[in-house]
A protein has these predicted regions:
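Hydrophobic anchor at the beta1->P-loop junction of P-loop NTPases
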Residues: 34
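ATP-binding Walker
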Residues: 37-40
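NTP-dependent small-molecule kinase module
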Residues: 3-4, 9-13, 18, 192-235
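Short beta-strand-centered segment that lines the nucleotide-binding/catalytic pocket of NTP-utilizing
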Residues: 53-71
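Phosphate-binding P-loop
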Residues: 21-29
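ATP-dependent small-molecule kinase phosphotransfer cores
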Residues: 66-125, 132
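Walker A/P-loop
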Residues: 43
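A glycine- and Lys/Arg-enriched "phosphate-lid" helix/loop adjacent to the NTP-binding pocket
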Residues: 146-193
Length: 235
């Protein structure tokens, strides 16, 4: 597998032999990675960094529909299967099974994101933001731990915030046969994924921060700017 092949295949793995890995890291050295859980403030931090420091932002969530349209069910099996589930189907499974399925989904989505990055011309620093940034995969793509950061919302904060995120949450739950059970399994799944992200980032020596709502978003963005090495500006 060559680097040119990686660039040509949206779902191609960015992890291969040593020569390919080195070339991929070189081509992505301008990329910063901001991952983490739902309700952790990733998108707001990215927006503030873009405004204060001029960094371009790639939102994995915003790319989802485009990737969904380009996905090959024979190649991106988990991405297509999980992405096509209705809420009632998604949350009907036990939380542990949901978490396992979602990690496979995120892994395939991340490879599609990497495909986009490899096809893009390198330039000014680019901040990639999204829940699909799995620590072990990102670790293979960076030259320095300072290129990556994960924000993980605490259980209590995430559950409180989800209930205030707007009518779309209630609408999704209303489509389920057992709305209360669906919400509980949804939150339990996210608890499992949060613990997993923390353990993985810690194991790999990568930075993760707990978000409980006690820090103003401006302060969180300023701390993220310092982590990534931005100077000056006001977040």
């Amino acid at each position: 597998l060559t680097t040119s092949a990686l660039a040509a295949e949206p779902g191609g793995s960015a992890i291969g032999d040593a020569a390919v890995d080195s070339e991929v890291k070189r081509r992505l050295r301008h990329v910063l990675w901001l991952g983490g859980s739902a309700c952790s403030g990733k998108s707001e931090v990215a927006r503030r960094l873009a405004a204060a420091h001029g960094v371009a932002v790639y939102s994995a969530d915003d790319a989802f529909e485009r990737h969904r349209g380009a996905a090959d069910p024979d190649v991106h099996r988990s991405f297509c299967r999980v992405g096509d589930l209705a809420p009632d189907q998604l949350w009907a499974a036990p939380a542990a099974q949901q978490a396992e399925d979602l990690l496979a989904f995120h892994g395939e989505h991340l490879e599609m994101v990497v495909g986009d990055l490899l096809r893009a011309a390198p330039g000014v620093p680019l901040l990639v933001e999204g829940a699909c940034l799995l620590p072990a995969r990102v670790a293979e793509l960076i030259e320095s731990p300072r290129q990556a950061l994960w924000l993980v919302a605490t259980t209590g904060f995430r559950r409180r915030l989800y209930r205030r995120r707007g009518p779309w949450v209630a609408e999704l739950l209303a489509s389920c046969a057992e709305p209360r059970q669906a919400f509980d399994r949804w939150m339990d799944r996210d608890d499992i994924l949060a613990s997993w992200r923390i353990a993985e980032a810690g194991r790999l020596g990568l930075s993760w921060w707990s978000v409980d709502g006690g820090r103003e978003q401006a302060a969180l963005a300023a701390a993220a700017a310092a982590h990534f090495g931005f100077r000056g500006g006001s977040t």
